[in-house]
Amino acid sequence: MPRFIDRVVVHARAGNGGNGCASVHREKFKPLGGPDGGNGGRGGSVVFVVDPQVHTLLDFHFHPHVVAPSGKQGAGSNRDGAAGADLEVKVPDGTVVLDERGQILADLIGAGTRFEAAAGGRGGLGNAALASRARKAPGFALLGEQGEVRELTLELKTVADVGLVGFPSAGKSSLVSTISAAKPKIADYPFTTLAPNLGVVSAGEHTFTVADVPGLIPGASEGRGLGLDFLRHIERCAVLVHVVDCATLEPGRDPISDIEALEAEIAAYTPTLQGDSTLGDLAERPRAVVLNKIDVPEARELADFVREDVETRFGWPVFEISTVAREGLRPLIFALWDMVAAYRAAQPAAVPRRPVIRPIPVDETAFSVVPDGQGGFVVKGTRPQRWVAQTNFDNDEAVGYLGDRLARLGVEDELLKLGARPGCAVTIGDMTFDWEPQTPAGVDVHLSGRGTDVRLEQTDRVGADERKAARKARRQSDDGEE
């Protein structure tokens, strides 16, 4: 029997963007072809997709690292690099995605539902895209951005119409195996069921699903027994059924005290989803009580004795059954279907889910410069850190281009205001370098274009009119000599 895993930590790494290409067009009779380096391809993203054929998170338990392919590098002749393919990861229906802080990022319900877990990095620009009027032939290109890396927690919350709750060895697994084709493990010791068991039940021409939740004990909401590991599986159930063992010989236990103890644990449990929007609050779900094991004479007497008290105290329908003798099962099945159908009809129609984009406001032009306490400075900001990550520091021209961009952003002016001196250490992102101002303090910054092809600036080239005038002058001189 495959292991049931309903909570895992996944390390998702999106693909990096491809590097841009620094290339010059070469063709016969075109000495000044200009830059033609293509851009790098976008990195692949990690996408979770709901697959109804997947029922557990077992694959992530053994393979927690998910890595998407990176984009390809750009090439000459204005050829852009190929984008990395998105990695689609199949997850079961009912998976909840949480971030490192425990905040819910997505609640994946319904076949085909998608969620981008980690975004791929953007490709670097080639020198053709970097060319401008002031920089006609850049000798460098930008590196691709790093893909997003995230540590996510996946929780599986069983999607079922009816949830069976009760003390250990109350007969929940036996009931599921009797009214459906499910074959859970059944034994005569507590906590035999270590994972929820799903079964499909037929009520005439109608069907509904039943989930057998592992046994609960007082203190489960605080982690006792199997605790919170399986309480979350009742969050999506439309109907909750208390399965009570009327044949138990444990002192201090009776059907009413068992129901009250379990209701206290359910009330103390705080759902992660704060109630499914299509089902309402957990405390408002309809309930039923099943008095089990009436094939035992003493259990039948107890069930007959407490049935009226249970109905009066809680106001829920009560059923007496025996899974061994298969007694009382048919009325229970049709009654559960009526409860499920009535509850579905009473709920408002589910609004079709529409993609909602909630962009996080980011001021990319903002940056801050703070002293590091050792005579250096640390520059923080979205743009400066991204620019540094995209710079090839082995290329002097690329470093100069980075300096121009930082100066335009105002980083150099801010360093001068804080008293930075030439040669002091400046840290941006993961890079620390010795800072040298482009101009002395107090002098306006005049930026010069970098990457200019000197051949384009030549003024001694002879034009057609000049050659024509030279030929005319030579003919006149030849005629004069004759």
UniProtKB/Swiss-Prot annotation:
Residues 359-437 form the OCT domain. Residues 160-341 form the OBG-type G domain. Mg(2+) binds at residues 173, 193. Residues 2-159 form the Obg domain. One of its GO terms (biological process) is ribosome biogenesis. It is found in: Cytoplasm. GTP binds at residues 166-173, 191-195, 212-215, 292-295, 322-324. CDD domains: Obg. One of its GO terms (cellular component) is cytoplasm. Residues 452-468 have a biased composition (Basic and acidic residues). Keywords: Cytoplasm, GTP-binding, Hydrolase, Magnesium, Metal-binding, Nucleotide-binding. Pfam families: DUF1967, GTP1_OBG, MMR_HSR1. Its cofactor is Mg(2+). One of its GO terms (molecular function) is magnesium ion binding. It comes from the Bacteria. Its EC number is 3.6.5.-. It is an enzyme of class 3 (hydrolase). PROSITE patterns: G_OBG, GTP1_OBG, OBG, OCT. Its main location: cytoplasm. Residues 450-482 are annotated as: Disordered. Monomer. Belongs to the TRAFAC class OBG-HflX-like GTPase superfamily. OBG GTPase family. An essential GTPase which binds GTP, GDP and possibly (p)ppGpp with moderate affinity, with high nucleotide exchange rates and a fairly low GTP hydrolysis rate. Plays a role in control of the cell cycle, stress response, ribosome biogenesis and in those bacteria that undergo differentiation, in morphogenesis control. This is GTPase Obg. It comes from Mycolicibacterium gilvum (strain PYR-GCK) (Mycobacterium gilvum (strain PYR-GCK)).
